[in-house]
Amino acid sequence: MNTIQVILFAVVLVLTVTVGQADEDSAETSLLRKLEEAEASMFGQYLEESKNSREKRCAVENVPCDKDRPGCCREYECLKPTGYGWWYGSYYCYKKKERLIST
């Protein structure tokens, strides 16, 4: 009789602990889900904009580029080479020249 009570007590204890943990886990996951939804609604647009505004891979100075789709970095422009590279017949990325506006 005494061993049956100990076994029954152990089973009830194990069930109580597992059910209690399941309730805590479900509460944590529901709270986590709510926080993720709130974060997505608040910062979703901002993250999307910052991802798209990031500069993609680009070509630097003296790298061949396509005239129609240059692919040069912001501070460079796609120009036909003058001087030593004119015989290659392709365009290259060169640093943009500072243009002074006369007043």
UniProtKB/Swiss-Prot annotation:
Expressed by the venom duct. Residues 23-57 form a propeptide. GO terms for molecular function: calcium channel regulator activity; sodium channel inhibitor activity; toxin activity. Disulfide bonds join C58-C73, C65-C78, C72-C93. Residues 1-22 form the signal peptide. InterPro entries: Toxin_22. Keywords: Calcium channel impairing toxin, Cleavage on pair of basic residues, Disulfide bond, Ion channel impairing toxin, Neurotoxin, Secreted, Signal, Toxin, Voltage-gated calcium channel impairing toxin, Voltage-gated sodium channel impairing toxin. It is found in: Secreted. It comes from the Eukaryota. One of its GO terms (cellular component) is extracellular region. The presence of a 'disulfide through disulfide knot' structurally defines this protein as a knottin. Belongs to the neurotoxin 14 (magi-1) family. 08 (Ltx-4) subfamily. This is Omega toxin Ap5. It comes from Acanthoscurria paulensis.
